[in-house]
Regions:
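Acetyl-CoA-dependent GNAT
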Residues: 2-71, 75, 80, 93-94, ...
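Generic structural signal for conserved hydrophobic packing positions in ordered secondary structure
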Residues: 18, 74, 108-110, 118, ...
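Short hydrophobic/aromatic beta-strand or adjacent loop that forms the aromatic wall/cage
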Residues: 47, 143-147
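Conserved acetyl-CoA-binding loop-helix of GNAT-fold acetyltransferases
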Residues: 79, 85-98, 123-127
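Conserved GNAT acetyl-CoA-binding A-motif
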Residues: 100-113
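Conserved beta-strand-loop-alpha-helix junction that forms the acyl-donor binding cleft
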Residues: 110-121, 139-143
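Short low-complexity, flexible loop/linker segments enriched in glycine and/or proline
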Residues: 124-125, 148-150
Length: 157
């Protein structure tokens, strides 16, 4: 049974999957267009980071960055390769959306890659009501990025 808990960045299993996440993001994105957070970025006080487990097996992780009182950003969504297309990403995204709503946010945005590798991620986000939007926060237009946003006042996915 899957369980979502606050992420422990000192856990070697988490560090290992984070290394895979960062390496993959850099390999699948044009230079200068990867916006994945490293350990120090995930330790920022405006970031909440969660891991998802099945018993002692780490399945993935995700984070929520508070941009303002009403606006949050989905960050660092990653699911272990062997656990993709099994509901893991959906579970962590549901958790992030529910947490944003519970914290009074009205909008949730994200940046993901525009390359084919990121098609499944974009499909997951669309299935939860995210739609493409202009760059937000400190992002600038980038052909290697797709920006998406969700109105949290809409019905829960």
């Amino acid at each position: 049974m899957m369980r979502i808990i606050q992420g422990d960045l000192s856990d070697p299993r988490v560090a290992g999957l984070l290394h895979i996440h960062l390496s993959t993001a850099r390999a699948q994105t044009a230079p200068g267009s990867a916006h994945a957070l490293d350990v120090s970025g995930l330790q920022s006080p405006d970031i909440s980071f969660w891991t998802i487990w099945n018993d002692e097996a780490l399945l993935g992780f995700g984070a929520l960055k508070r941009l303002s009182k009403e606006h949050g950003e989905v960050k660092s969504m990653h699911v272990a390769q062997s656990m993709r297309r099994k509901g893991t990403g959906r579970a962590i995204l549901h958790h992030i959306i529910a947490t944003a709503r519970a914290n009074g946010m009205s909008r949730l945005s994200l940046e993901t890659g525009s390359w084919e590798y990121f098609l499944p991620a974009r499909a997951l986000y669309r299935s939860h009501g995210f739609t493409e939007c202009p760059p937000f926060a400190d992002y600038v237009p980038d052909p290697n990025s797709v920006f998406m946003s969700l109105d949290l006042h809409r019905r829960a996915p």
